[in-house]
């Protein structure tokens, strides 16, 4: 049986825990590098992104205006079709004696034609909106890609000096020689 003194005595020989703590070396943790990169991204990317979004907004608004005009044209045609339907109905009342079935066929044909026209216009409007949206998305992607390439090229050109350039060429030449020696 183990008593209380044996238990406390055995705890006295355990080494204290070590190795836990915070790294206070700012250069070792890359906080400065990370903050500089984030600052540069925010500073340069903000203007480009807002310009792209403004352009996209204008394109969407113009597409919506075009779609609304198409919709107004469709409603005008629908009103004309309804007016014609009213005329047909009035004529149907006048010649009801001569053939009720003929009148019904004309009425159905007119309604079907109006519905088909409206559906075609609605489909055309939806296709136009989808096409314009996709085109705008593609343009935004292209603009972002071009801008990123320009910035990357500018960064490379600003950081590439003669010494670094010569070291890179020497390194590549030595790699080619090593490859040539291994193939021989």
Curated annotation (Swiss-Prot):
UniProt entry keywords in alphabetical sequence: ATP synthesis, CF(0), Chloroplast, Hydrogen ion transport, Ion transport, Membrane, Plastid, Thylakoid, Transmembrane, Transmembrane helix, Transport
This protein's GO CC annotations: chloroplast thylakoid membrane; proton-transporting ATP synthase complex
Membrane-spanning residues: 31-53
Protein name: ATP synthase subunit b, chloroplastic
Originating gene: atpF
InterPro entries assigned: ATP_synth_b/b'su_bac/chlpt (IPR002146)
Keyword DNA-binding: no
Similarity section: Belongs to the ATPase B chain family.
Gene Ontology molecular functions: proton-transporting ATP synthase activity, rotational mechanism
Miscellaneous: In plastids the F-type ATPase is also known as CF(1)CF(0).
């Amino acid at each position: 049986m183990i008593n209380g003194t044996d238990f406390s005595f055995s705890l006295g020989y355990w080494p204290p825990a070590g190795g836990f703590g915070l790294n206070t070396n700012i250069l070792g943790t890359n906080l400065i590098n990370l903050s500089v990169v984030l600052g540069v991204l925010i500073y340069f990317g903000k203007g480009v992104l807002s310009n792209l979004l403004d352009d996209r907004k204008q394109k969407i608004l113009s597409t919506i205006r075009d779609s609304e005009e198409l919709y107004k044209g469709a409603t005008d045609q629908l009103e004309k079709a309804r007016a014609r339907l009213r005329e047909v109905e009035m004529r149907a009342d006048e010649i009801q004696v001569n053939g009720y079935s003929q009148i019904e066929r004309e009425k159905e044909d007119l309604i079907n034609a109006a519905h088909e026209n409206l559906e075609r216009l609605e489909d055309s409007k939806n296709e136009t909106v989808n096409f314009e949206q996709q085109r705008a998305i593609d343009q935004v992607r292209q603009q972002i890609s071009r801008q990123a390439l320009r910035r990357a090229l500018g960064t490379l050109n600003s950081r590439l000096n003669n010494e670094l350039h010569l070291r890179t060429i020497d390194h590549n030449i030595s790699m080619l020689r090593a490859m040539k020696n291994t193939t021989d």
